Structure formats: structure tokens, C-alpha cells
């Protein structure tokens, strides 16, 4: 099966799509780049920026074979942005205030020493699993490839789940007449990762939580208007925002050998895509030592936004 990437457009057996994210890399047989004008002529304007032909695996005549491969790994961010600790921050911020003619800041209620990057980052686990079954005779061929990818992100609550399928078959009715089909599909759940920007800006003098109430701690008054506690994004918001995508692309074809070097081929192609998203904004309460009772509400209301889109091209 040939996938042809044409100026950011993909062709799969005469079907042009916007990307090939439904392909499992384990099903790719080879890749070829076309650059010369003579090779690109048949693609017209779609090939203006070049063509990449991706050939996926198909069955070969021989015994039925089952291949299984699996891998696991971990990922961690080592090269983090250097930030100040609590004592360094207090010194530098007071220097700024004094140079502006203001009094030093009162840190009595702000005794934390938080590395916010440690709070939102994690060591992510990932696994990639693939199974393929192939078989062929003189009359028929089939190939089935299944894939599953699970990858935890470097940010807590971030997790990707992706299932892929590649199925193709070809049957020879006679020596000159053949039929077949190709089907590729994907089901993917994508995470909503947040909190990195806040982790780089939040003052280290604030603790993550209030020990008595268990509420997420607010930031000092000089930051509250611009920056929230990064855990609000990762624990309260990012954990509730999800999107799920489905996509199926395929075709059926028939071809007949008219003459020795002349073959007629008819193809019907289809591309179906569906996307569902859910965004939940909860009521957010934090601990603020500057208000009576300590408990403060940051948001006025909770809301749920859901979206669904479907497209079909043939």
C-alpha cells in the first residue's frame, strides 16, 4: 500500500487526506522521496513541494506468520529551567522593592520552599505493542496489523492511549482479474497538559497545599492577578479535559489485465473521522492566608463544554 505525502497532503491508494496519524509505524515497509520534476508531473499542484511515498506492509506468498513485538521505557526531563529557591527569591525581590523606594516584603506567612517543576513533572512510563498476522496463497493474500501505544507525559495527569489497525487483502479470481481492499483505523485519547508556564513563574515561597485544610495554597498577593498555583492546572483542570478521536480510511479496488502490459484499475476510497472533546471547569477553592478563615473561591461557577465533529470523504 502506498501513502503519498503531497505538499502536506497524504495519498493512500488514491485517497488524499490531511495527515497520516492513523498509521502505525510498525506497519511501514519503506519510504521514498520524489524530488525531480518528471516524477512529480503526475501529481500536479499537489506535488509542488515534493512527494513522500510511504509503503506499508503486505502479505507475501508463504506460510502464515504471526509477529509480536513489545517495548517499554521511561522518560524524564533532565534539562530543566534554572530557577531560584525561596531564600534567593526573597533576597532578589526585596532588592527590587528597596531599589524602587518601597519597604521589604513581609514573608511571615510565606515560609515555603517549593520547586514547582518537581511538583508538576513526573517520570513517564511508555509502552508500544504490535501484533501482525500475514498469510498468502496463489489466490489470496491478507495482512492484519494491530498496535497499542500508551505513553504517560512528563506532566502529571498527562496520558496518551492509541489503538491502530491495518487490514488489507487481495484475491485473484482468475489470472487476469483481482479484487482487494485496504483499511486503516485509529482510536486515540489525547491528554490536556497544563501547568508548565505557571511552574516557571510561581514564587517558591508558597507551599503547594495548606496542611490543615488540604486545599491548594494560593500564591502571594503580588502574583495572584497573573499567576495561579500550577497544581490548579494539572490537578483540577488538566485531569478533567479530554479529547477522543476516531478515524478510518480505506478503499476497495478491482483490476483487470486487458493486455500483457495494460491493466485497468477501479478504486473507491473513503475517509471517516470523528472527534469528541470534553472540557470541565470546576469551582476552585484555595487556601489564602490573607483572608479570614483562609478559604477563598477563585472561580464563580462550574461549567462543562462538550464538542463533537464528524467528517466523511469518499
Question: What is each stretch, according to the model?
Answer:
Residues 2-35:
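Short acidic/polar hinge/loop motifs at secondary-structure boundaries
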Residues 4, 60-113, 139, 153-158, ...:
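Surface-exposed loop/interface segments of Gram-negative outer-membrane beta-barrel transport/assembly proteins
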Residues 12, 16-17, 47, 126, ...:
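Membrane-spanning beta-strands of outer-membrane beta-barrel proteins
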Residues 17-22, 43, 171, 256:
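A general structural signal for stabilizing positions within well-ordered secondary structure
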Residues 25, 61, 126, 137-138, ...:
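Outer-membrane beta-barrel channels and translocator barrels
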Residues 25-67, 126-128, 141, 147-152:
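A beta-strand signature from Gram-negative outer-membrane beta-barrel systems
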Residues 34, 55-57, 132-136, 145, ...:
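Transmembrane beta-barrel domains of outer membrane proteins
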Residues 79-81, 119-123, 133-137:
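Outer-membrane beta-barrel initiation region
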Amino acid at each position: 500500500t502506498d501513502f503519498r505525502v503531497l505538499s502536506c497532503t497524504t495519498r493512500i491508494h488514491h485517497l488524499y487526506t490531511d495527515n497520516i496519524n492513523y498509521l502505525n509505524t510498525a506497519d511501514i515497509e519503506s519510504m521514498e522521496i520524489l524530488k525531480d520534476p518528471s516524477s512529480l508531473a503526475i501529481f500536479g499542484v499537489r506535488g509542488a513541494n515534493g512527494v513522500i511515498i510511504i509503503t506499508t506492509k503486505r502479505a507475501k506468498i508463504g506460510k502464515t506468520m504471526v509477529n509480536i513485538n513489545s517495548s517499554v521505557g521511561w522518560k524524564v526531563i533532565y534539562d530543566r529551567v534554572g530557577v531560584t529557591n525561596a531564600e534567593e527569591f526573597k533576597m532578589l525581590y526585596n532588592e527590587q522593592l528597596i531599589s524602587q523606594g518601597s519597604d521589604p516584603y513581609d514573608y511571615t506567612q510565606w515560609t515555603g520552599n517549593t520547586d514547582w517543576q518537581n511538583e508538576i513533572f513526573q517520570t513517564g512510563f511508555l509502552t508500544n505493542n504490535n501484533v501482525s498476522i500475514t498469510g498468502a496463497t496463489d489466490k489470496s493474500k491478507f495482512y492484519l496489523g494491530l498496535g497499542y501505544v500508551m505513553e504517560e507525559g512528563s506532566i502529571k495527569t498527562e496520558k496518551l492511549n492509541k489503538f491502530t489497525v491495518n487490514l488489507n487483502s487481495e484475491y485473484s479470481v482468475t489470472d487476469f482479474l483481482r479484487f482487494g481492499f485496504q483499511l486503516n483505523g485509529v482510536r486515540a485519547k489525547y491528554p490536556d497538559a497544563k501547568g508548565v508556564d505557571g511552574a516557571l513563574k510561581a514564587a517558591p515561597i508558597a507551599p503547594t497545599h495548606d496542611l490543615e485544610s488540604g486545599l491548594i495554597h494560593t500564591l502571594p498577593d503580588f502574583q495572584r492577578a497573573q499567576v495561579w498555583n500550577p497544581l490548579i492546572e494539572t490537578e483540577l483542570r488538566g485531569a478533567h479535559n479530554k479529547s477522543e478521536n476516531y478515524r478510518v480510511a480505506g478503499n476497495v479496488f478491482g483490476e483487470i489485465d486487458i493486455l500483457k502490459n495494460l491493466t485497468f484499475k477501479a478504486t473507491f476510497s473513503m475517509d471517516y473521522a470523528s472527534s469528541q472533546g470534553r472540557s470541565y471547569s470546576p469551582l476552585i477553592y484555595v487556601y489564602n492566608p490573607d483572608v479570614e478563615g483562609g478559604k477563598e473561591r477563585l472561580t464563580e461557577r462550574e461549567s462543562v463544554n462538550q464538542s463533537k465533529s464528524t467528517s466523511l470523504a469518499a
